[in-house]
Amino acid sequence: MEKKYILALDQGTTSSRAMIIDEEGEVIGVAQEEFDQIFPKPGWVEHNANEIWASILAVIAGVLLKTNISSKEIAGIGITNQRETTVIWDKESGNPIYNAIVWQSRQTEDICKQLRKDGYEDTIRSKTGLLIDPYFAGTKARWILDHVDGAQERAEKGELLFGTIDTWLVWKLTGGRAHITDYSNASRTLLYNIYDLEWDDELLKMLNIPKAMLPEVRPSSEVYADTVPYHFFGEEVPVAGIAGDQQAALFGQGCFEKGMAKNTYGTGCFLLMNTGEKAVRSENGLLTTLAWGIDGKVEYALEGSIFVAGSAIQWLRDGLRMVRQSSDSENYASRIESSDGVYVVPAFVGLGAPYWDSDVRGAVFGLTRGTEKEQFIRATLESLAYQTRDVLYAMEQDSGISLKTLRVDGGASANNFLMQFQSDILGVPVERPENKETTVLGAAFLAGLAVGVWKDKNEIKKHWKLDKRFEVEMKDEQREDLYEGWHKAVKAAQAFK
């Protein structure tokens, strides 16, 4: 039986998905399963790692049954994952010693405060490209070792293993034969030196993380190990590609050249720009991260995250009940010529890059007696585009590269009003692909390269198909006036703390 399909596993924050991709890069079938969110205290978010694993087994079985494709026809497995979420488990039993601590969780704030107090910010920045923040995996591992009896001692003896979700899934799929991660995920731990490409002894000492528990770091596209037959309908299938979700989306968007960038409009926005084989240190509060490692070399990216994007549209729907469904926001926004001076600063959980202000809160400016819900909805959508421009401007400043086009994906990229305004406020065209499942595609392409389904990046590029290109329609003067108004609104919101 010909092995011509790739199985891509997308382990996300609220659900796990499995997709089967054919040689043309088309999605043949998909299965999805949600799992529970655990909130032990305000600001804490955890997952049951065994439940995540069960959801992965369920979606693998589900997608094979749904498509009537045999496990014998699967050439390889690619994995993409929610980044930074951390699991520590017992090497012998395979049981986690505590829940997985999720990327959103703020429970390690005290550890971060201590690191800042001890003066580690510059060291961390210069070695990892990251900021000290509870977002990243290293402090989560430290928290688990601190809060589970005997964990530190057991970790030092080599009895416990640490991993982000990719590592956990590969370990389970291969029956414990492979304890690995890839460059993209390792670069999100606060423990990995992105220049020397190794776990950094000084950083490990700083957080007192025993080296014995860390996974081996491997390229993003490589045959790592085979699945154990009992997890895969009697087949040993190569696990052959891994990338964190945002890097996978950059790859799935075909952003292979230096200076190419993508924005994923999900709950938040994640912007990544490929900076090639050179790591660009940011002077503007962006993260420097590993994009992927392929063909014996690594490539880097600049990353900026916007905390509130799609969730602002959900707020219009669920909080304010201004729209029945998220897609209605496009119709309301398009009915009027402008927002009439209304600005929404959706800083519900602070502002991310390039402001990094966790104390600022949401605000609305410019309301008059004539303001109606159309202006309010339009201004909320526009805020996503303004924040994207903030980040892209910072990327251009840091990298010295002028953006020529922006590729987009994620739920809100389906909103034509938003995409047109995005193009207008950036002053560059915006390209939306036919297949918006770019994260899953990225994982599939990485695995397919390793097992020979695709020859090289050039062949993969041909599978990127344009759905719509949004050309710039706004005049320069209007663009700058609107953007200046946005900056005034942000400053005013920051002053209100």
Curated annotation (Swiss-Prot):
Keywords: ATP-binding, Glycerol metabolism, Kinase, Nucleotide-binding, Phosphoprotein, Transferase. GO terms for biological process: glycerol catabolic process; glycerol metabolic process; glycerol-3-phosphate metabolic process. One of its GO terms (cellular component) is cytosol. Pathway: Polyol metabolism; glycerol degradation via glycerol kinase pathway; sn-glycerol 3-phosphate from glycerol: step 1/1. The phosphoenolpyruvate-dependent sugar phosphotransferase system (PTS), including enzyme I, and histidine-containing protein (HPr) are required for the phosphorylation, which leads to the activation of the enzyme. ATP binds at residues 13-15, 267, 310, 314, 411. It catalyses: glycerol + ATP = sn-glycerol 3-phosphate + ADP + H(+). ADP binds at residues 13, 17, 267, 310, 411, 415. Its EC number is 2.7.1.30. The modification Phosphohistidine is found at residue 231. It comes from the Bacteria. Homotetramer and homodimer (in equilibrium). HAMAP family: Glycerol_kin. PANTHER family: GLYCEROL KINASE, SUGAR KINASE. Belongs to the FGGY kinase family. Key enzyme in the regulation of glycerol uptake and metabolism. Catalyzes the phosphorylation of glycerol to yield sn-glycerol 3-phosphate. This is Glycerol kinase. The lineage of its organism: Bacteria, Bacillati, Bacillota, Bacilli, Bacillales. The gene is glpK.
